Amino acid sequence: MRYLTAGESHGPSLTTIIEGIPSGLELSSEVINLELKRRQGGYGRGARMTIENDKVSITSGVRHGKTTGAPITLIIENKDHKKWTDIMAVEDLPDKLKRKRKVIHPRPGHADLVGGIKYGYSDLRNALERSSARETAARVAVGAVAKCLLSQLGIETMHHVSVFGGVTIDIPETLTYEELRTKAQKSELSIVNSEQEVEIKTYIDQIKKDGDTLGGVVQTIVTGVPVGLGSYVQWDKKLDAKLAQAVMSINAFKGVEFGEGFAMGYQKGSEVMDEIIWSEEEGYSRKSNHLGGFEGGVTNGQPLLIKGVMKPIPTLYKPLQSVNIETHQPYKASVERSDPTALPAAGVVMENVVATVLAQEILEKFSSDTMKELTKAFQDYTNYTKRY
């Protein structure tokens, strides 16, 4: 399974082509739209979320509610484009029109300047349009397809925010994964402790008034994953490494960890290794899950526990010091429409990119021209792991 996304933040649309999905997977635009709606939610989102109401058009690869095995094309219209037709025009325009909304004051923390230098732009809008987090809508659409496939195999994903703008969320250790999912989905902040909602929302409101932004930490949890996905035989076959790359590819993400991650640097080996147990019903399992479901880059049958840290959004309404790229004189950075925080939405994106990588790994490992073929191969394999 592979995919490509295309499109700019204020262009006509975002387009994605997915290749390698088996035939016979039940799929509808409604399922994808539900995931896109989740991405647009959350407390702290900005004005654009009132403009865009993302809906996908499936233009190939699905017929009568099921995938055909052919490439799937997904198109998401940018409703805001109608206000940007000259600015984002494909055809050449007079210089006066081309200077409209020209960006020459790069924003610290964004791809504006590095993109301009790398690709030789005189207008940094070319960089910011493609590097915008708007592109993640396309990846969420891909993830929605992947989640449909995983669900057919009994693999489920969820996410919650564990740190919001420096505020650590108090999470009761007794909560089951299903309870975590339910509580996080009910929260505008994607947190599981409702008693902290007011405190954090008040903080977000103040940050917005200050013209500043907030980041935080998101955890994605995946259940139902069998032993043996990924491989240790080559460095680039390790599944946790593939997932780390995927999480780090999300806009504004600056770190990733599995299980207890960086905290293990302060612990002894006897405290973090997950002891092995066996039962007639389940086969091999672990007494704990400090390692987050991976050993040697291979899944060990435990739930996958993955955390990603998102930096505060770099577009500030009280802009920082920058430089005019035409005069090289000091200037305040450009201001584009932005959010004080997009952490809950980033959690949805992370959940979906994780689902995409897992679907790719499963489709590589198992025979999968059709969903019937894949389901049988997957079930036969999981039965084998229990008998081993």
Curated annotation (Swiss-Prot):
The lineage of its organism: Bacteria, Bacillati, Bacillota, Bacilli, Lactobacillales. Keywords: Amino-acid biosynthesis, Aromatic amino acid biosynthesis, FAD, Flavoprotein, FMN, Lyase, NADP. GO terms for cellular component: cytosol. Its EC number is 4.2.3.5. It comes from Streptococcus uberis (strain ATCC BAA-854 / 0140J). It catalyses: 5-O-(1-carboxyvinyl)-3-phosphoshikimate = chorismate + phosphate. Pfam families: Chorismate_synt (PF01264). NADP(+) binds at residues 39, 45. This reaction introduces a second double bond into the aromatic ring system. NCBIfam families: aroC (TIGR00033), PRK05382.1 (NF003793). FMN binds at residues 130-132, 251-252, 296, 311-315, 337. Homotetramer. Reduced FMN (FMNH(2)). This is Chorismate synthase. One of its GO terms (biological process) is amino acid biosynthetic process. InterPro entries: Chorismate_synth (IPR000453), Chorismate_synth_AroC_sf (IPR035904), Chorismate_synthase_CS (IPR020541). Its cofactor is FMNH2. Pathway: Metabolic intermediate biosynthesis; chorismate biosynthesis; chorismate from D-erythrose 4-phosphate and phosphoenolpyruvate: step 7/7. One of its GO terms (molecular function) is chorismate synthase activity. Belongs to the chorismate synthase family.
